[in-house]
């Protein structure tokens, strides 16, 4: 895909009532050694890597190739966090941030910028937080397809396109949360143990106790209960 940056998307009061309004969406490929941001970066979003910037919107970025660094106010301006292909990060309105690709690799990035009460509520409820802005999601075709669909909808700008974009933002946030959460559990073998527990409970739900399930998994009951609740929500 050629680099595409769509700026100043039309947003009207009805769009805001929907709960999410999209301001910008796009894709760009930064080749190794290329300046960042590129010189054709829209003035509304231009920034210096050294000085960073503050936006008045959320942006969800997805890096599909390459590597680089990310910094934000909450985690510390002097702290550069490694970013690589298969990671997403969320920028928050009013939050200083800076990010850039490694000169040796460049990177490919998708992004979508948005505002609205829907996302504000997710932040207020603790699903997304300034102190956890990065997500390990790996490379997924469904995420790439969503960004591509958003770009196509924004190019066409047919009647109701903002509502289509709002639905895509919802789905992208859901997948960022889902893939990152499961990545954390898989790294600690939690997913495997919980899967075993669910099979035991399903097969012997009339005769097996939670304490027995914990014992078969070589876990203390308190540890099993805590882990099961974190994974399933129950």
Where are these regions (language model features)?
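Generic protein-terminus/edge-of-domain signal
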Residues: 1-81
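Ligand-binding loop in jelly-roll beta-barrel domains
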Residues: 94-117
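Conserved metal-binding segment of the jelly-roll/cupin
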Residues: 83-96
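Amphipathic alpha-helical segments enriched in hydrophobic/aromatic residues interleaved with Lys/Arg
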Residues: 121-183
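N-terminal positioning helix adjacent to the helix-turn-helix/winged-helix DNA-binding module
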Residues: 139-142, 189-197, 232
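Basic/polar phosphate-binding segments, predominantly the helix-turn-helix DNA-binding elements
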Residues: 207, 211-234
């Amino acid at each position: 895909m050629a680099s595409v940056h769509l700026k100043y998307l039309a947003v009207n009061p009805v769009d805001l009532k929907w709960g999410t309004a999209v301001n910008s969406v796009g894709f760009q490929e930064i080749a190794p050694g290329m300046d960042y941001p590129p010189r054709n970066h829209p003035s509304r979003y231009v920034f210096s890597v050294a000085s960073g910037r503050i936006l008045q919107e959320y942006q969800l970025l997805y890096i599909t190739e390459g590597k680089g660094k990310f910094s934000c106010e909450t985690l510390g301006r002097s702290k550069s966090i490694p970013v690589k292909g298969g990671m997403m990060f969320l920028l928050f309105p009013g939050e200083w941030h800076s990010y850039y690709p490694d000169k040796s690799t460049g990177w490919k990035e998708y992004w979508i910028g948005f505002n609205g009460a829907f996302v504000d509520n997710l932040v207020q409820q603790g699903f997304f937080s300034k102190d956890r802005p990065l997500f390990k999601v790996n490379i997924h075709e469904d995420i790439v397809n969503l960004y591509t669909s958003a770009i196509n909808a924004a190019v066409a700008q047919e009647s109701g396109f903002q509502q289509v974009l709002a639905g895509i933002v919802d789905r992208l946030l859901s997948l960022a949360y889902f893939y990152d959460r499961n990545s954390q559990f898989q790294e600690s073998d939690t997913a495997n143990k919980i899967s075993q527990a669910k099979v035991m409970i399903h097969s012997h739900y009339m005769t097996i106790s939670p304490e027995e399930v914990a014992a078969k998994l070589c876990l203390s009951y308190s540890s099993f209960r805590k882990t099961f609740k974190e994974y399933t929500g129950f």
